[in-house]
From Swiss-Prot:
It is an enzyme of class 3 (hydrolase). InterPro entries: Ribosomal_Su5_D2-typ_SF, Ribsml_uS5_D2-typ_fold_subgr, RNase_P, RNase_P_CS. Its EC number is 3.1.26.5. RNaseP catalyzes the removal of the 5'-leader sequence from pre-tRNA to produce the mature 5'-terminus. It can also cleave other RNA substrates such as 4.5S RNA. The protein component plays an auxiliary but essential role in vivo by binding to the 5'-leader sequence and broadening the substrate specificity of the ribozyme. PROSITE patterns: RIBONUCLEASE_P (PS00648). Keywords: Endonuclease, Hydrolase, Nuclease, RNA-binding, tRNA processing. GO terms for molecular function: 3'-tRNA processing endoribonuclease activity; ribonuclease P activity; tRNA binding. Belongs to the RnpA family. This is Ribonuclease P protein component. NCBIfam families: rnpA (TIGR00188). The keyword Nuclease applies. The keyword Nuclease applies. GO terms for biological process: tRNA 5'-leader removal.
Length: 111
């Protein structure tokens, strides 16, 4: 995923948490904020409660891969995906389907 597609700065995360709205399902929480950008930007948050660094990095890699696979269907907004406990045990297909579900609730996923 290119750097231009990532939310990296603390002020951007803070703006998303303060001014954005949130939706959730059992595996993910998504905060989103509409900005006039030519493409989406995403930030990922995986807590230490999910496991050691290897486990957390595996979850982040799978999330990035799923987001790039669905990039043509995503709205041009900033959003942060927060992984909840239990996502570390899911397969890629389960992560993908749960992510699509929560993004549809947030109205970030176009069919």
């Amino acid at each position: 995923m290119k750097k231009s597609y990532r939310v990296k700065k603390e002020k951007d995360f803070k703006a998303l948490f303060d001014a954005g709205h949130s939706v959730a399902n059992r595996k993910f929480v998504v905060y989103c904020l509409d900005r006039n950008l030519p493409h989406f930007r995403v930030g990922l948050s995986v807590s230490k409660r999910l496991g050691n660094a290897v486990t957390r990095n595996r979850v982040k890699r799978r999330l990035r891969h799923a987001l790039m696979d669905m990039s043509s269907q995503l709205e041009n907004q900033d959003f942060v995906v927060i992984a909840r406990k239990g996502v570390e045990d899911l397969s890629y297909q389960d992560i993908y389907s749960n992510l699509v579900h929560v993004l549809k609730i947030a109205k970030l996923y176009k069919d």
